[in-house]
Amino acid sequence: MIGLIVEVRPLQAHFRVPYNSLLLDSYPFPPRTTAIGMLAGAIGLPEEGFRNLLDELRYGVIIEDPGARTEETATIFKSQRAPVYPITKVLYHKPYYRLFFAGKEETIERAHDALLDPVFIPYLGDSESLLYPAGGDYVRIVDVEEGEEATLKSVVPGEEYHRGARFLPIRRNHLTPREYRMPIDFVYKGKGRRAVYKRVVAFAGGFVELANPASVLLFDGEPVFMF
């Protein structure tokens, strides 16, 4: 089995948490739907192709560096009589993510080639957050094996974490574990769609030791929980 590792360090990143309004909060990592959407755009797939990728690919992420959390506040004027509200948007400055994908060999190879020569410009989250490579060898295909591991750097499911876990920080700039509702899929009805969420725990700058080993994929020996 083969997998794809994509290492990115954008100048800024914003992954909107969709269940709030006046505060445009951000996940500290690319959610599954965002990361797979990035591949779909690079390949040049229409909406139907994106839906197929969501069904086919598995995804995991390690936050190597959360970056600096910043905020910008703006007011949108619709008309003189409309109520005016300030809106605050959360951004992460120069984060560093390692994205992991697993799926059919031909799909992994196609995604690899597309990121090197994309149909549409890849971006992370909103259209202002362009994808910047973390280095020269930022996208590569590696061997993948199934395994079990209790010590992880990747985002983990909430249910696994709450069975018992401890966080071991190894860097001063770290994120303590926090639970999020991550969009992992969409349910389509007519021309509309709604997100399907899964509770996950994200952290950075250290390891999480789970009480029980979890089923993972090993990307060149690196254990990653996949969604």
Regions inferred by a protein language model and the residue ranges of each:
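Residues in well-ordered beta-strands of folded domains
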Residues: 7, 60-62, 100
